[in-house]
Amino acid sequence: MAYQMELGGESSPQRKAGRGKIEIKRIENTTNRQVTFCKRRNGLLKKAYELSVLCDAEVALIVFSSRGRLYEYSNNSVKGTIERYKKAISDNSNTGSVAEINAQYYQQESAKLRQQIISIQNSNRQLMGETIGSMSPKELRNLEGRLDRSVNRIRSKKNELLFAEIDYMQKREVDLHNDNQLLRAKIAENERNNPSMSLMPGGSNYEQIMPPPQTQPQPFDSRNYFQVAALQPNNHHYSSAGREDQTALQLV
């Protein structure tokens, strides 16, 4: 986009033209000024056209004369080019401002986070008993109170977990007892349905048929014993010196 008000002047301070130097200043003579304006305007329009063709550029040229007359050139549309220009200026301005605002915000947030990290580190050192040499008695009492509250919370949580474990074990014990009772009931029902199974070792009536062995020795009963000598022939004698071996045979 190019905006130019042609006043009959050049952009450089001095320019060599023709046979001498022409001073760049406002032309006082009205006729000469108008002639110069027409020549320079046509040259400017020609340059704009050449730029758009040679470089495939979007060019829009607007020129107002000293009398307020409008002269324009555009290879596309003057209005469309102006709208594009406004949008580009707006986007650049917004992008710059948003980026600057974001940068400031992140810098502030970063500073806050660094301060929080330092504060937490100092608090942890104090809880561990470090860096307490410069603390006042009031600060030490506050620290002691914090530690007591922390210990109480830890102890409460520990007791809660222990009680939960005990409750679980008690419920587990009840479940196992119920399972055991159910198993006994199934065994008893099995034995009622199959009486022959009750006579086998391991059945419920096995202990009634075969009483448990007695731990106390039974009293001696002479009726259960016979002398072995009474079963031997009369002519059999032992040559022991006045003694006979007598062996008792118990009948069960």
From Swiss-Prot:
Return one GO MF term: RNA polymerase II transcription regulatory region sequence-specific DNA binding
Q: Give the top-rank taxon of the lineage listed in the UniProt record for this protein.
A: Eukaryota
Q: Where in the cell is it found?
A: Nucleus
Name all MADS-box domain ranges: 19-73
Query: What's one Pfam family the UniProt record gives for this protein?
Result: SRF-TF
Listed under GO cellular component are: nucleus
* Protein name (database record): Floral homeotic protein AGAMOUS
> What is the source species?
Brassica napus (Rape)
Gene that produces this protein: AG1
